[in-house]
Each structure stands twice: as C-alpha cells, then as structure tokens.
Amino acid sequence: MKISFIGSGKMAEALISGITESHTLSPNSINCTDRDDNKTTYLNKKYKINKYTNNLDAIKNANMIFICIKPQDINILSYELKDQFKDNQTIVSILAGTQIQTLQKLFNHDSIIRIMPNTPAQIKKSVSVWTHTKKTDPIHIKQIKSILTSIGNEFYVEKEELIDMATALSASGPAYLFLFVESLIEAGKNIGLPDNLSEDLTTQMIDGSINLLNFSEESPQKLRENVTSPGGTTEAALTVLIKANFKANIIKAIKAAY
C-alpha cells in the first residue's frame, strides 16, 4: 500500500505522524507534495517520507491520494489532475464543505473517501467522521479506518450530510472552545488574577472538567447542577450567561457554521 498527500500542512502532518508512529505504513510508502517546498522538505526530514515537486509523479504509483489543500484551491488542482486517476486508486478528501459529487465531477473519478478530522489530530486526539462511495475498494476502506484510528477516534456515517453537520460541531468545535478559554483567562485577569495564574487555573480547570465528564456516568447537565449551589457564586455567574442567551447563541453559531 502506497499513499500520497497533495498538500503538506498541519492536518497532513498529523495524519503522517499517526501513520508512521503506529506503523500503519512505512515512511517509504508515503509521498508528499506542496506548492511550498519548505513544507515537503520538513516532512521528508522529520518523518523520512518521500517528497515530490510534481503532483502527477507523486500520485503515479499511489493507491490512495489524500487531498489536503484549501477548499478554494480545488478547482486549480482539478485542472491538473482530472482524468489522471486510475480505477484502482482512491481519492481521500479532507476538504470542508466539498461534496463527494463535486469531487467526482472535478476529477472524473468514482472511488472517493471523504473524511473530516479536527485539529486535536496533532496530539492523536482527533474525532474523525467519514464516508465513502459505493465504488471504493474494500481494502482502501479498511486502510482508512486504520489511518484514522492512528490519530484518534473515527466515526463512519452512511449519509454524507452528517459530515457537514459534524464539521460544524466537531471540526470547528476546537475554535469555539479556545474562544471560551480565551474569555475565561481574560475574565480572570480582569478581576485581578496575575496573568500566568489566570492561564494556569483556566487550562487546568478545563482539563479536569473534561476528564470528569469522560469518567463520570452523570450527564453534563447533572455535573453542572452539582457545582451550582442555590444563591451561590456559580449560580450568579450562570444567571448572567442564561440572560445573555448563552446556550441559544451556541446553537445559533453551530447552525451558522452548518
């Protein structure tokens, strides 16, 4: 099995790191290309994979080709690679918002896997949602499951529309959480906590709370209620958030992303 990455940014590196560290594939079985030669040189040196300057050369002997470019660049890539894929090759797309049907038309190719990981893939904590076309090789389906497992948890869905929904929740989700963390740190500073202490308290509180949620059998609502004493400080804070339609605005944000 040989695979190629067209686009060698952070998500490509996360996948390459997971694949090589888990020994899912050998470094010599992995090719990469990018318009920025510095990126492929970096990946070549760090992971001992093969670097190419030409996309056609990179995909020539690959079984699976990962498209890891920005969605707005897909039309340019299709001009170069349309009709260049063989029947025994599978395109793997990580492009947000780009439908399988669109990819089939752009590349005139039917064997396609669409995946949507998220940035915690960089630390092997991704949640990846994926699906595939009916004409995808069963061997490639099995391989992508192993690859996604190497960077975290994977969830197969039959309906492609669920990937777009998941993109709004789990793929964009880290950004929402980081904004919340930023806000908590800023609030801590605002009430007088030293900068470093506010940052440490916030990040460790988030870490502990997520671990509690994962290990507890209680629902998020029940865990929240456990912290909230009637007439206490937590209730005072939550009242402000509720009056500001905190939950409704989160739902509104997810719908905007979808």
Language model features with spans:
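Internal alpha-helical scaffold of NAD(P)-dependent oxidoreductase catalytic cores
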Residues: 106-111, 127-165, 178-214, 256
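NAD(P)+-binding Rossmann beta1-loop-alpha1 motif at the extreme N-terminus of oxidoreductases
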Residues: 1-53, 57-61, 126, 189-190
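Short pre-catalytic strand/loop immediately N-terminal to key active-site residues, enriched for Gly-Thr
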Residues: 112, 163-168, 220-225
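Small-residue helix-packing motif on alpha-helices
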Residues: 30, 40, 58, 74, ...
